[in-house]
Amino acid sequence: MAHQPVGDSQTITTSATSARVQFAVQTDTVRVVPISQNVHVAIGTTATATTSDYFVPAGTPATLNLGRASSMGIAGVTTGAATVIDLSEGMGNPFKVDDVLTISGITGETGFNTTAKVVSIQEARTIGYAQFGAKLTIDHDSRGLFAGDAVVTAAEARRTLTVAARTDSGSGKLYVQQVQISGDQ
């Protein structure tokens, strides 16, 4: 089985309390390797690891499923106490309420690119059975920004997750890397 690393590797310093790292999901699998201590691993939008979560023995790599790797181009933004994101038309909508998103690639106005923003409203724009685009409302206060200056040509919304880990006792490290897997598993 071969692994193709995707994105940056991250390190969590582990102890008997939960520690976490957040990342934009780019593939459906994450590989974790605990060093020096056994760990319990939790994955979710705002995960906190407990001793009842997935157990990984020290020095043993584990590959865990992240679910879908969702991203979508952004067609526009509307400012407010919560920011409304217009998704590209004709593409559907891979996101749902309570997903956590990273917004990137917006130029022309600083402050629209954000991390860890929760989707609070999902609004489909349909005519008959055809979906022509969708709107998402995220918990980002953009009242001080001017949407008219926002250039969304390369803008993207991407699903974000958290990996959390803790030990039973003592401290160590957990290496976290998103991977693509090929070959026999």
Report the location of each language-model feature.
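Short, intrinsically disordered N-terminal pre-domain segments
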Residues: 1-22, 169-185
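Intrinsically disordered, low-complexity Pro/Gly/Ser/Thr-rich segments with frequent PxxP/GP/PP motifs
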Residues: 6, 10-12, 49-68
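Surface-exposed ligand/attachment interfaces on beta-rich extracellular proteins
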Residues: 7-26, 47-50, 77-88, 108-110
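Extended extracellular/luminal ectodomain segments enriched in beta-structured repeat modules
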Residues: 24-29, 94
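Asparagine-centered strand-capping/turn motif at beta-strand->loop junctions
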Residues: 30-36, 165-167
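Short, surface-exposed beta-strand/strand-loop-strand elements in extracellular ectodomains
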Residues: 35-53, 177
